[in-house]
Amino acid sequence: MNKKILLVIFIVTMLIVDEVNSFKFGSFIKRMWRSKLAKKLRAKGKELLRDYANRVLSPEEEAAAPAPVPAKRRR
């Protein structure tokens, strides 16, 4: 299963659990925010954002690295 399907299953499960325990939308959001999955997603998002910001702020480092030239083969 891919991550999108697992995320949908997780949200639906949380909705069912909340409905059984008298649904309160605020507690549902709080529970989702504190879940392990949400923490992993936030950490991954922060990491990707940090990497993107570093690439945008310092593009000269990438441009300075020349592309490797393929060596000519002898026959």
From Swiss-Prot:
Endpoints of the signal sequence: 1-22
Q: What is its main location?
A: secreted
The entry's localization annotation reads: Secreted
GO-annotated cellular components? extracellular region
Report the record's Gene Ontology biological process terms.
defense response to bacterium; defense response to fungus; killing of cells of another organism
Citing just one GO molecular function, the answer is: toxin activity
| Domain-level remarks | Amphipathic and cationic peptide with an alpha-helical structure.
Tell me its family: Belongs to the non-disulfide-bridged peptide (NDBP) superfamily. Long chain multifunctional peptide (group 2) family.
Protein name (database record): Meucin-49
Origin species, per record, is: Mesobuthus eupeus
